[in-house]
C-alpha cells in the first residue's frame, strides 16, 4: 500500500530505481514477508541479473491509518541490519502516529531503529517541506548534491527549518497530533452512532468510512470528491 508504488506519478522509477512490492497486512510490511523475498532473491544463482533490493520503505502511519507496533519495528530493523540494507520510514503523518492513544512507538524508538526517516510538515500545519533525519549521522555523501540534481534543493531552503523549529518548540508538534487524534475519535463516534461502518479500524486521523453510491453523490453536491 506504500504510496511510492501507486502514486507519486512513478517518481521513484523516473529517477532510475525500481519499486519492488511484497504482500501487505493491514497496510504494513511484515518482517517475515520481507525476509522471504530476500531469501528467494539470494537463493537464485542469477540474482546478479535482477533488481537488487536496496532499501526497505515503510510508512508510519500506513496508507490505511494503521500503526506499526514497537515489536514490529524492531523485527524489521533487525532484519534490515542482518541483510545490510537501510530501513527508511515515511513520516508524512508522523505526528498522528505518535499521538495515537494506544501506540507504543516513540520518536526516540524510530530514531533508534531506522537508518533514515522524515518528519512530515505539510500534513501538520507547515506551508511547505518535510524534515529528513539521519539518526546516527549517516547522511549519504553528496546528499545535497543529489537533491539539487533532482530539483529538490530550494533556494533559501533554510527558511523551511523555521517551521520545524516552531513545531518542535513547546511540544506544538505533539499538540497538533493529539488534537487531530481527539477530533478523529469524536468524528468516528458520531459516524458510528449514525450507522456508518468503516473499511479499516484506524487509531489516527485517517478514517475510511464506507458509503454507498447515493451517499457519495449527495456529499459530492456540496463537497468535491
Give residue ranges: language-model regions.
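Catalytic PLP-binding core of fold-type I/II PLP enzymes
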Residues: 68-100
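Conserved core segment of the aminotransferase class I/II
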Residues: 130-154, 165-170
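Conserved C-terminal alpha-helix-loop-beta "cap" of PLP-dependent enzymes
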Residues: 185-225
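Structural signature of PLP-dependent enzymes
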Residues: 146-148, 167-188, 203
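PLP-dependent aminotransferase-class I/II
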Residues: 16-54, 58-61, 68-75
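Conserved PLP-anchoring active-site segment centered on the Schiff-base-forming lysine
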Residues: 1-6, 35
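Active-site PLP attachment segment
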Residues: 12, 93, 107-141
Amino acid at each position: 500500500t506504500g504510496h511510492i508504488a501507486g502514486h507519486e506519478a512513478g517518481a521513484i522509477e523516473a529517477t532510475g530505481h525500481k519499486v519492488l512490492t511484497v504482500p501487505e497486512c493491514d497496510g504494513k510490511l511484515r518482517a517475515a514477508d520481507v525476509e522471504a523475498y530476500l531469501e528467494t532473491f539470494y537463493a537464485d544463482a542469477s540474482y546478479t541479473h535482477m533488481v537488487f533490493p536496496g532499501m526497505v520503505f515503510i510508512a508510519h502511519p500506513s496508507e490505511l491509518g494503521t500503526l506499526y507496533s514497537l515489536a514490529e519495528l524492531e523485527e524489521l530493523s533487525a532484519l534490515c541490519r542482518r541483510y545490510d540494507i537501510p530501513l527508511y520510514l515515511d513520516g508524512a503523518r508522523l505526528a498522528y502516529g505518535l499521538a495515537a492513544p494506544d501506540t507504543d512507538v516513540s520518536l526516540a524508538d524510530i530514531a533508534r531503529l531506522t537508518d533514515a526517516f522524515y518528519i512530515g510538515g505539510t500534513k501538520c500545519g507547515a506551508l511547505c517541506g518535510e524534515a529528513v533525519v539521519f539518526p546516527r549521522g549517516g547522511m549519504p555523501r553528496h546528499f545535497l548534491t543529489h537533491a539539487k540534481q533532482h530539483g529538490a534543493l530550494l533556494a533559501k531552503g533554510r527558511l523551511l527549518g523555521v517551521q520545524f523549529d516552531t513545531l518542535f518548540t513547546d511540544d506544538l508538534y505533539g499538540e497538533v497530533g493529539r488534537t487531530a487524534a481527539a477530533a478523529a475519535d469524536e468524528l468516528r463516534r458520531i459516524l458510528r452512532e449514525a450507522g456508518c461502518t468503516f473499511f479499516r479500524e484506524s487509531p489516527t486521523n485517517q478514517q475510511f468510512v464506507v458509503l454507498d453510491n447515493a451517499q457519495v453523490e449527495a456529499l459530492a453536491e456540496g463537497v468535491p470528491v
